[in-house]
Amino acid sequence: MTVDVSTIYLLDVATGESVEAELRDAIEQAQLDDWQTKWQPALLAVLQELARKGVPLSQWPQSWHWNWAQKTAKVQGLLAFRGFSVVARRETQGLAQVDLTKASREPGQAGKPLVYLDYLEVAPWNRLDFGVAPRLRGVGSALVTAAVALSDEEGFKGRLGLHSLPQADAFYRKIGMTDLGQDPAYQNLRYFEMTVEQARTFLEGEQDR
């Protein structure tokens, strides 16, 4: 399989400088190795510190139990499922998996095909909710941009849908997605969609950064 690689730029939070990165339209073994050998130890250290401080489980990172090896294995070889990864400084900085079989719920585009963003996660050291400044900023936005671009390529005109973990709700509102409320059929997670117009505005904003 040929992997398309695009050059993108992230922000080094400590220095304010741009960092060159790769946006890859696949999740390969190298990314899974990074998840296992780098993400997991970093996450474990965070969880141990949260436990030591007596932080309630409800405030722990809500994706801590995600297993990317299992997620990718489950859809391997299925053309309707795609993966994306962001690599910088020889490390995987973020991962995303999308599903091309879903349809829109937003009243203005109900029933039309969209790209469903099944999972999106940035490396533990890039998260905002760990009580320390992230190393790199822009990873999540880059993965959303990739999903919107795929939607456009597939003829879905940028339409995007997803269920958000509560800790990420504010991020999806910030990038202009429509909050369609809690979904009782999906663990009461809030369901967000990006319309054609919102996708255009989002991409224009990313290009101007």
Language-model features, listed with the residues they occupy:
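Non-catalytic substrate-recognition and accessory regions of acyl/acetyltransferase enzymes
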Residues: 1-134, 142, 149-159, 167-169, ...
